[in-house]
Amino acid sequence: MTKRETVERRLSEVPPGVIRPYTQTELKSVFSTLKDIGKAEPAVAALLAGESPLKDFIAAAFTLSPYLRDMAAADEGLLTLAISKPLEPLLTDLVRDARDCWKPAEDAVPVENEVMSRLRIAKRRLSFVAALADLARIFTARDTTRWLSEMADASLSAAIDHLLLSAHESGKLKLKNLAAPSEGSGLIVLGMGKLGARELNYSSDIDAVVFFEPSAGIIDDPYDATENFGRMMRRLVRIMQERTADGYVFRTDLRLRPDPGSTPLAIPVEAALLYYEGRGQNWERAAYIKARPVAGDIKAGENFLRELTPFIFRKYLDYAAIADIHSIKRQIHAHKGHGAIAVKGHNVKLGRGGIREIEFFAQTQQLIAGGRMPPLRVRATEDALAALTEAKWIDAETRDSLTEAYWFLREVEHRIQMVRDEQTHVLPDTEAELKRIAFMLGFEDTKAFSEKLEEVLRLVERRYSALFEQETKLSGEAGNLVFTGQKDDPDTLKTLSTLGFQRPEDISRVIRTWHNGRYRATQSVEARERLTELTPDLLRAFGESKRADEALLRFDNFLSGLPAGIQLFSLLGNNPALLSLLVTIMSSAPRLAEIIAARPHVFDGMLDPALMSDVPTRDYLAHRMGNFLSNARHYEDILDRLRIFAAEQRFLIGVRLLTGAIRGEVAARAFTHLADLVIEAALNAVLSEMEAAHGPYPGGRVAVMGMGKLGSFELTAGSDVDLILLYDYDDTAQESTGAKPLDVVRYFTRVTQRLIAALSAPTAEGVLYEVDMRLRPSGNKGPVATRISAFEKYQREEAWTWEHMALSRARLICGDASLMEDARSIIASILSQKRDVAKVSTDVLDMRSLIEQEKPPENNWDFKLINGGLIDLEFIAQYLALIGPVKGLGAHEPGRNTAEALQALAAPVMESQAFDDCMAAMGLYTEISQIVRLCIDGAFNPKEAPAGLIDLVCRAGDCPDIPTLEGEVKRLSKAVRKAFVAVVKNGG
């Protein structure tokens, strides 16, 4: 007990102004809630009747945390409890309530639902009180984590005692002491991670592993013991995490046990020790640094950890393990380089400079030296930093700065989770929600908070990065299934059929091919061993997909092109999510499957564990591209690196879309950001080459304008890019100034031709983009490069209506800043002209009619060309952009996608239902088109598409099946066509 805790602390001690209310509107709503609570709770009514820092604090806290507010409203006595009693005695009572809830009352063993209810009530109340004490700065983050950990210990212990007593009562085992069921039971529950270190975060799940000692003798038959304890653990998970009317206790994860894919939930001690001795990995050593017996037979748990000590802390200085420890870090944390750290959306646990880096800073050094230095064998991160200082491994300044950073980040983490009781470590990505976190931490505004956080993150990143200088392969464990000999094993064929394969003989033959070492990826003994271990999980995963045979054969095609396999097989065995993702690609996205079969390197990006949480923004992609190009040696090297980077990032954006991590509109924007960056890098490389060969052109300026889907941020995975290259120069110059000068036309024509070649020439590394320049002035008849003055003259004097429609989607994407600004001004001027509405209407209708005649849709799923499809929606937006100056619809804004243009231009002129239908259609077409273009080449036909793609399309359309989705497409397309006619035919 600390000195501070000898004095009873109360919430009424809260300092004035420790936090600020979120908004005045929220504050009014909170006071209304508090008044309702006060009707039944005199203490709350009395609080409201007066003026006090406590009243202001409670109101502010409830505006900042909807979760706390809802808890107080649902359990009206809860707030009275929190404001009326000393904090430590109250929390001690709640922990005791949880710990004792299993005990028989009047000789009757409580039923499981009663135990569950009492645990949930105690946990909920402790969470509420601890959060308020933390927000009030009466508790430190240390206090909060300790109380949460004590509640977790008590809850697990009570649940285990209840389960043991229940099993005793039903005759499944025989306890030694009914008053203390766990005592002498041999059932070991180890708390791992933050639970083991007594460092639980506010909405933490808990990691535990369960072992049992058969020699304890409470179950005679060891086979019965495995089955009974396994069943007991399933009930334990239910008791702890099932959501009921009373909430939940803790989300509980038992997957840190040995080989979780193939072992029971409770493992015999001897089997566990054999596993760790023979097959234990460095990540498991790191995990066991924090392990602590938290429930069950504590003495047996301590004995188990003593026996495991030589595995965790080796006697020699274990530098050899560091590369493998780094591989663990790679699994949890995405390398983000040294650019600016964006506070919004940052993961304070796993991101750069986050909590995990501090933990690994300590744990890595504990693993290196803990065998020789027993004082380093401590669980808590703060204690570990202190021990490392005592051992002279780090200096006092490092200890103090990292300790301070650790607890600050834990406070931030707690605030993130207190808002809505979500197990997240990611800061909000909006200013409004970030303000909530800043206020909860006592900052004046988000700027002050962001500056402090970035300072802390950079400090941690700096300290941590020095520890790791190399990476090695990851290792993995899985089950085993061996295919030997030349003949099929009958039992194996039955298993394959049971797993879901229609042609088990073919699948058996394919797998024997793998194990015979006929592919480069399976030529080494180690690779085949890893693949053998992986095979059961692999077959199970593919068997669960629709058309399992087809999907596995695509995987075989992928495998045949791999240069090596050990790392991949290890990763797939270690990472079920990665295996699931690979199966999804093989079963639903033939186009992606072909890409990774042809270019396996694109698969590397899937190993990034932050892949699904990192949104591929322009900054995100630019940072990665900068790193990837940084060591390029020459022009061709730059282009090859661009091709590799673009292929990988297109693939990774597609993977995010495929898994639902991002929506279609986000994918479109990401594909476009990628194209922008690649085109800019290619242009810069081309200009450097031109200047090296022919010198700069006096006054020369070049800019690239994106048209079509590139201009409107609507690219898909398979889109080409529509470009116009603009240039300008000094009129007095006759030629460029290099050793091989060129006249102006040849110079800028060659720049354009080189850019087109850089982007679209097929090479060993593939093609960047197919380039279409038909939207330049005079189309294919005109020069490939256009001087800015000629561009303006053409647009003002010669351009057709359809060319001005296309101009409404134009966007300057790279090049000389002043020329880009000149072009923007010209476009804005042209689009601000007042046109003859009737003529524009006639031209648009004629053009739509011509497209219908010359390019009829392939089927009802050809969303671009069907009546009421994407062209109709785009034409509505473009038509309104042209007549907008006459109708007063607002100025043109470059870079708007079609949905944004409709929102700005169509909403004021359309009936609300028609507008809603158009927006719904736009969303539906976008989602499905993005998925289809990602997964297959050519048109989508439900009768021929892979079964997995059918599921994805239905998911994208938010419909249960294809007939329902087809009906929705017909309804919306009909509404869009009606709106198109109403808007365009009637002149807006």
Curated annotation (Swiss-Prot):
Function of the protein: Involved in the regulation of glutamine synthetase GlnA, a key enzyme in the process to assimilate ammonia. When cellular nitrogen levels are high, the C-terminal adenylyl transferase (AT) inactivates GlnA by covalent transfer of an adenylyl group from ATP to specific tyrosine residue of GlnA, thus reducing its activity. Conversely, when nitrogen levels are low, the N-terminal adenylyl removase (AR) activates GlnA by removing the adenylyl group by phosphorolysis, increasing its activity.
Give the family, as the similarity comment puts it.
Belongs to the GlnE family.
Describe the reaction catalysed, as an equation. Answer: [glutamine synthetase]-O(4)-(5'-adenylyl)-L-tyrosine + phosphate = [glutamine synthetase]-L-tyrosine + ADP; [glutamine synthetase]-L-tyrosine + ATP = [glutamine synthetase]-O(4)-(5'-adenylyl)-L-tyrosine + diphosphate
State if Lyase is listed as a keyword.
no
The record's InterPro entries line, in alphabetical order, gives:
GlnE, GlnE_rpt_dom, NT_sf, PII_UdlTrfase/GS_AdlTrfase
| Stretches the record annotates as Adenylyl transferase | 476-988
Its needed co-factors are: Mg(2+)
Q: What cellular-component terms does GO give this entry?
A: cytosol
Question: What UniProt keywords apply to this chain's record, in alphabetical order?
Answer: ATP-binding, Magnesium, Multifunctional enzyme, Nucleotide-binding, Nucleotidyltransferase, Transferase
Give the Gene3D superfamilies listed for this entry: 1.20.120.1510, Beta Polymerase, domain 2, Nucleotidyltransferases domain 2
Taxonomic path: Bacteria, Pseudomonadati, Pseudomonadota, Alphaproteobacteria, Hyphomicrobiales
Residue ranges for the region (Adenylyl removase) are 1-472
Q: Which NCBIfam families match?
A: PRK11072.1 (NF008292), PRK14108.1 (NF010706)
Q: Which SUPFAM superfamilies match?
A: Nucleotidyltransferase (SSF81301), Nucleotidyltransferase substrate binding subunit/domain (SSF81593)
Name of the protein in its database record = Bifunctional glutamine synthetase adenylyltransferase/adenylyl-removing enzyme
Gene Ontology MF term list: [glutamate-ammonia-ligase] adenylyltransferase activity; [glutamine synthetase]-adenylyl-L-tyrosine phosphorylase activity; ATP binding; magnesium ion binding
| EC code(s) of this entry | 2.7.7.89, 2.7.7.42
Q: Name one GO biological process term.
A: regulation of glutamine family amino acid metabolic process
